[in-house]
C-alpha cells in the first residue's frame, strides 16, 4: 500500500511548505512504499505533496508520483486502485484533448478525469482510493477517499495549515 502526505498553508499564514517538511513526513512512511518516493512543492511554497510508491498497476517511471497533468495545473498524490480505469481511459481517449504520459496508469486517468469532468469524475470511479489533488487554477486542495473508506485518509488542521 502506497503512502501519501501533503500540506497546505492557509491564506495569510506565515508558514511555508518546504521540501524538507514534506520529505520528513513522507519518509516516516518508507515501509508503505519501497519502490520509490517523490515530492512536489508549489512555486509559492503554499502547498506540497509527497508519495511513497508501491508499484502495482504501472511499474514505469512515468507513473511516479506526485504526478501532474500536461500543463502542471493539477498535481496528485494517490494511493489505491481504480478498477475501471481502462474503461474511463477509453472514454477520455474518445473525447480527445488529453496528452498521455503512461500506457495504463490509473493515477493519470484520475488527473485527466478531473480535467474533463471536475469533481463529478468521482462518480465514474470504481475502486478503493485516497487522493490529495491540488488544482492550481482555482487554488484548491481536494482530499478524497473511496465511498466506504477502504483506503483511509487522515488530516490535521493546526497552526494555519492542514497536513
Predicted regions and their residues:
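Cysteine-centered catalytic environments shared across enzyme families
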Residues: 1-163
Amino acid at each position: 500500500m502506497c503512502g501519501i502526505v501533503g500540506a497546505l498553508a492557509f491564506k495569510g499564514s506565515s508558514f511555508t511548505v518546504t521540501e524538507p517538511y514534506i520529505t520528513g513526513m513522507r519518509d516516516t512512511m518508507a515501509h508503505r512504499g519501497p519502490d520509490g518516493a517523490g515530492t512536489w512543492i508549489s512555486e509559492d511554497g503554499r502547498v506540497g505533496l509527497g508519495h511513497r510508491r508501491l508499484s502495482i498497476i504501472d511499474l514505469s517511471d512515468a507513473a511516479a508520483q506526485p504526478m501532474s497533468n500536461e500543463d502542471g495545473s493539477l498535481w496528485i498524490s494517490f494511493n489505491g486502485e481504480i478498477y475501471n480505469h481502462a474503461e474511463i481511459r477509453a472514454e477520455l481517449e474518445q473525447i480527445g484533448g488529453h496528452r498521455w504520459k503512461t500506457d495504463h496508469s490509473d493515477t493519470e486517468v484520475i488527473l485527466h478525469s478531473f480535467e474533463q469532468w471536475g469533481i463529478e469524475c468521482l462518480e465514474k470511479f470504481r475502486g478503493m482510493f485516497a487522493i490529495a489533488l491540488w488544482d492550481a487554477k482555482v487554488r484548491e486542495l481536494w482530499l478524497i477517499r473511496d465511498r466506504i473508506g477502504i483506503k483511509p485518509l487522515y488530516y490535521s488542521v493546526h497552526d494555519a495549515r492542514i497536513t
